[in-house]
Each structure stands twice: as structure tokens, then as C-alpha cells.
Amino acid sequence: MALWRTNDSKVYLPPAPVSRIVNTEEYITRTGIYYYAGSSRLITLGHPYFSIPKTNTRAEIPKVSAFQYRVFRVQLPDPNKFGLPDPNLFNPDTDRLVWGCVGVEVGRGQPLGVGLSGHPLFNKYDDTENSRFANGNDQQDVRDNISVDNKQTQLCIIGCAPPIGEHWATGTTCKNVPVPQGDCPPLELVSTVIEDGDMVDTGFGAMDFANLQATKSDVPLDIAQSVCKYPDYLKMSADTYGNSMFFHLRREQIFARHYYNKAGVVGDAIPDKAYIKGTGAGRDPISSYIYSATPSGSMITSDSQIFNKPYWLHRAQGHNNGICWNNQLFITCVDTTKSTNLTISTAVTPSVAQTFTPANFKQYIRHGEEYELQFIFQLCKITLTTEIMAYLHTMDSTILEQWNFGLTLPPSASLEDAYRFVKNAATSCHKDSPPQAKEDPLAKYKFWNVDLKERFSLDLDQFALGRKFLLQIGAQRKPRPGLKRPAPSSSASSSAKRKRVKK
């Protein structure tokens, strides 16, 4: 859409024309063929606060927390190489097939529960909620063992591109002048890809705690050396092609439980005109005003669950109405309502004593999660015209490459050399090496890969989500053969009736 804009000169010139972004429904034809696809039970287990490195007697234990993002990269089969029920459905010379996601259900196992997080040496100075008097001595180590129930979050983002998150990180000065030691560094809002295992906002903000908190004790253990990301809804909603987020489900809940301030020297002193100086211990000098609250997610109920429910996609929030480009789908999930941490105790000696002694037992903690993904996909067709191919190439050039569209060179009339053994010491070096396999552009990111290439089925009535979808569209189930005898044909009449003759 072209808009007029003003400039510094006195003459107003129209802006350069901008290509129009079209909705996928304008160039995609939807067929009446639907497929069901579902994953197996997806389980992960590990330590909820940090990863434990590998030792000689034990394998590495990963970090698995309820406050991590679970980003599933769902791999779909190529519909152009799929065995279709109707071979005349499309013309391979002019058409291509794509998948359209019309239904999804994310299943969650395990019971509801609250998993605590905390720090054995939490930077807690004064109780500023019920303070009797300020400590007045910030030279001693007054850190304490504090645990909290973090912010409650349920989140599900559906798209065909990786989700985008935002967080506060260390910025740079304008002239690259180093920040003096002890001064507050400049901050910058950074947008990055959300990967599987990244930490969510637990109530302490979305920031790079590893680089912005040198005490390593201002937040709980699970995020003290991590980066907490918050979904960048503004950027994903403004995505030009709408691939990052077809739609999303979100529920957040938090309140402040306790109020503290931080121990340490206050970097930015309060102006003298902002208060009247006090007298006595603890009031002159005044205590720290760096206040911080411990969050709480409050009560958890099954009435507020967004998972284990089917969702039908009729109209996406962006221009992509559920089309799975590159035969992939990204499901981003967060569910802190099932954050129970499993505490495990083992005896140090084979024989357990009759009296309890803490030194005779070892305590461990683990956290496990359980997911299941189910989808309903609709087979869609694209008629490739010159305009559509140019549009798709602008959006993502790899789409046409996967469809084997490219420039075909004319056959050469000259005689060329072809060596049998190319890589050996007797043959001269050949610079033109054979083409390597194409690299995955998302290989540098970490996702939970779910392969559904062999899990598609046309029998929707054999699956729970498929039956719900058939009920949604008003379609009838396929009759099961052999359960009833066929009704007799109307042409096969019983014995012929006699014609009554009047006397």
C-alpha cells in the first residue's frame, strides 16, 4: 500500500511503490482431503535447576524445568511425493501440493502441582514489607535460603517458522567507550529465536542474568546463569508473511508475595532534595532502596487449562492461514501448572538404621514432562504462475528449490573431460568438487525434532482428534463393513399377488 510522506524539502514526492502482501487464501486451492497425524508420547527428564556434567560413573543429566520453553519442530512428509487417493488431483507440471494445518491438540500428562525454585544464598537484605528497623550494616553477608513459587504461565504458539523472543541484554556505548568498572552498563532490547530449553520469564523479568547480575544470588538458581526470554508478540504479529505465529494461546498469573531490598552499595544515590535526612542508627545513612519482590503464581486449577483441548484454525492472525511451508511446523509450549519436582532419597548404607540420621541419606531432585501432539492437515494445491513463483521466491527461495524449480542450462556441444578417479594422488586436483548436501538453515538452533513423515492417516474416525474434527465439520463416519446385512433390493419383490376377479 503506497502512502504519501513528507520530507525536508518543499516538494512532496510519492514514495516508491510497495509490493502488496497477499493472503495465502488468494493463491491456494483447498481440497476436501484431510489427514490425521500424531506423535508418540514425548517424555523428558532431568534436573530442574541446572545440568549435571558427565562423570566416570554417571552420564550427563540435562536441565529439565517446567519454566523452560518446549519448541517442537514437526517434520511433515512432502505431499508432492505422497500416495494420494486421487491421482488426478493435481497436474505436476503446473501445480504443487502443500499442507494446511486446520486442527491441533497439545496433550499434557502428569498431575497439577507447584514446583518451587530458590537460592540457598539469596540476596535478601531487609524485609521491606514488615520492617521493624533497617539493618544499617551492609558489610556482612546477610544472604539467606529463600524459595519461591514462580509466575504461572501457560503458552502455546503455532507457526511454520521459529518463534521470536525478546530480553534485555548488555548494550554498547555510542563511541565504544568502555564503561567504568562498577558503573551500570547500557541496556539493549534484543530479539532472538526462542530455542528448546530457553528459560521463560519467571517473575523476575526478561533479561540476561548471567551478564547483568554479578552477585549470582539476586534471582533463583535456575535462572541465575541463564537468559529469560519473553515472546515478542509485537514482532511476530507484525511478521510480513505471518509465518512465525498463526495463532497463540496465553495465560499468565502472578502476584507479589514478599518484599525485600538488595544488599550492596547503591550505585545511584537518592538526591538530597528527595528526602529529609534522619538521625540514629539505620537512618543515617539510609538503607538501600533497590527493592525486589518474590513472585507467586497463586492457585492452580484444572478449570484454567489451555492444553488437552482441540483448536480449529479458520482464519489466522497474519497473512499465512495455516500453510506449512517447507513441510514443517513449530509448536512452542510452556506449562508451569505441572511443575512438581520429584524428591528422591537413597540410603548411604545397605542397612537402614532404626533411628533417623540425616547423614545416612542422600537427597536428589528431578523433574519430568510429558507431551503429545495431534494434528489435522488439509491437502492444498497451488497453481504456479509467474507472479506466484516470484512472490514465493521473495518470501523464501528454498520453497521453489524443494519443488525442483530452477534454471535448466542447455546441453553443451563441446567435449568435456570426465575423470574416473578424482580424489587420488595420481590425478590432478579438480577445483570443481561435487555439490554437497544442502545445509539446514536452522541447524544452529536447538529444537525438539518430531518426525511425522510416516504417521499420516486418512482414517480420521480411528483417532480421537479425527472424530472431533468430523463432528466439527458435520461429516459422517465411514460405515464399517460386515456389521449389518445389506437391505433387500426393492426390485426383488415377494411372491406375486393373485389378481382378484369380480364375480
Swiss-Prot record:
InterPro entries (UniProt xref): Capsid_L1_Papillomavir, Capsid_L1_sf_Papillomavir, dsDNA_vir_gr_I_capsid
Localisation per UniProt entry: Virion; Host nucleus
One MF annotation (Gene Ontology) recorded for this entry: structural molecule activity
Pfam families on file: Late_protein_L1 (PF00500)
Keywords: Capsid protein, Disulfide bond, Host nucleus, Host-virus interaction, Late protein, T=7 icosahedral capsid protein, Viral attachment to host cell, Viral penetration into host cytoplasm, Virion, Virus endocytosis by host, Virus entry into host cell
GO-annotated cellular components: host cell nucleus; T=7 icosahedral viral capsid
Residue ranges of the TM segments: none
Gene3D superfamilies named among the record's database cross-references: Major capsid L1 (late) superfamily, Papillomavirus
Regions of compositional bias (Low complexity) in chain numbering: 484-495
Domain of life from the UniProt record: Viruses
Function: Forms an icosahedral capsid with a T=7 symmetry and a 50 nm diameter. The capsid is composed of 72 pentamers linked to each other by disulfide bonds and associated with L2 proteins. Binds to heparan sulfate proteoglycans on cell surface of basal layer keratinocytes to provide initial virion attachment. This binding mediates a conformational change in the virus capsid that facilitates efficient infection. The virion enters the host cell via endocytosis. During virus trafficking, L1 protein dissociates from the viral DNA and the genomic DNA is released to the host nucleus.
Record-stated family: Belongs to the papillomaviridae L1 protein family.
Subunit-level organization: Self-assembles into homopentamers. The capsid has an icosahedral symmetry and consists of 72 capsomers, with each capsomer being a pentamer of L1. Interacts with the minor capsid protein L2; this interaction is necessary for viral genome encapsidation. Interacts with protein E2; this interaction enhances E2-dependent replication and transcription activation.
Name this protein carries in UniProt: Major capsid protein L1
Organism: Human papillomavirus 82
Taxonomic lineage of the native organism: Viruses, Monodnaviria, Shotokuvirae, Cossaviricota, Papovaviricetes
